[in-house]
Amino acid sequence: MRKTIAFHIPSLIGGGAERVICNLANHFAEEGYRVSMITSEMEDHQYYQLDEHVTRVVLPKPTGNRILKIFRRLGILRKAIRDSEAPVVVSFIGMANLRAILATRFMKTKVIVSVRSAPGREYKGKEKLAKFLFRFAEGAVFQTGMARDYFPGTVRRKSTILMNPLLGDFSRARYEGQREKEIVTVGRLHPVKNHEMLIRAFARFHQDYPDYVLRIYGDGENRTKLEELIQELACGESVFLEGNCDAVADAIWKASLFVLTSNTEGMPNALLEAMALGLPCISTDCPCGGPAALIRDGENGLLIPVGDEDALVDAMERILSEKDFAEKLGRSAEQAKEQYAPEKIYQMWEDYITEVADR
């Protein structure tokens, strides 16, 4: 009998979690599974490509007052999961996890929830509800030990930690030529990414290293605020908001340094990808521990405290003034492409899903 699996996420708009769940669905389809991708929002938007053999199910919006909508939404999701005939449904992100648990109560379908960022932020205002409901999920996937430790022992004991796979064109050989005098970062322009600190730190750094430029790839709600900051600091000729980029590997491959200044992160794909390309990297040591899981401070990158502009300036100056140190960090970082190879990560997912299904 053909194996069947369902995935549930609010939408397929651009984002790290959306990319991972789409690639997981595509992998299982390629392995011969019958795959359903169930979404509940943004039906007209799909940033990432799904395999033609993945069935896309967009849930109709519930009607009625606020209370009725809650119950009708659960009923609609329950029917979609039942219609998929999947013995296991894997859900990603916040409320989708909680809805999947509630929608499958007293069904034979087993639920694996996946937390993709700091749980305290992902479930802000719903912390007690999440900790309670997660006990009824048959499995849970976290990206870091810090995220897993947020939940009670009943959840931790049936969970696993699975990192993100390295996808796309980031497994290419490290660039060995003369590097461009560019500092780069990749991520949506959102307050949690704290690009303000990066821009302010770069403006200070630039006073002593005027040949360097900062390129920020990504777009989002914070763009206007960042443009105003760039104007305020009079660094419009050295700081560039490049917008979304379809060829990130090409854009950053020859850069001298990658910097991540987030206040919180799950497992930061952008940092993993920059490391795999062999770039020297700096990251904040932010919750829920994703950067610290990737970077061994001083060996394959540098970690700095969250929000510490002075530490960032010092780290940038150290790496870009000590070529041997930068070379060491970059070559050590490049090993990430072996550790996070897609075939390894997908097999770990498949093994865990099979284990949960067989419990």
Language model: regions and residue ranges:
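A conserved mid-protein helix/loop that constitutes part of the nucleotide-sugar donor-binding site
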Residues: 18-23, 181, 188-209, 221-228, ...
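A conserved, positively charged/aromatic
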Residues: 105, 111-141, 153-154
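Donor nucleotide-sugar binding/catalytic pocket of nucleotide-sugar-dependent glycosyltransferases
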Residues: 135-171, 185
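Aromatic "clamp/platform" in nucleotide-sugar-dependent glycosyltransferases that forms part
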Residues: 244, 263
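Short hydrophobic beta-strand element within catalytic cores of glycosyltransferases
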Residues: 280-285
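Conserved acidic donor-binding segment of nucleotide-sugar-dependent glycosyltransferases
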Residues: 296-298, 302-309, 317-323
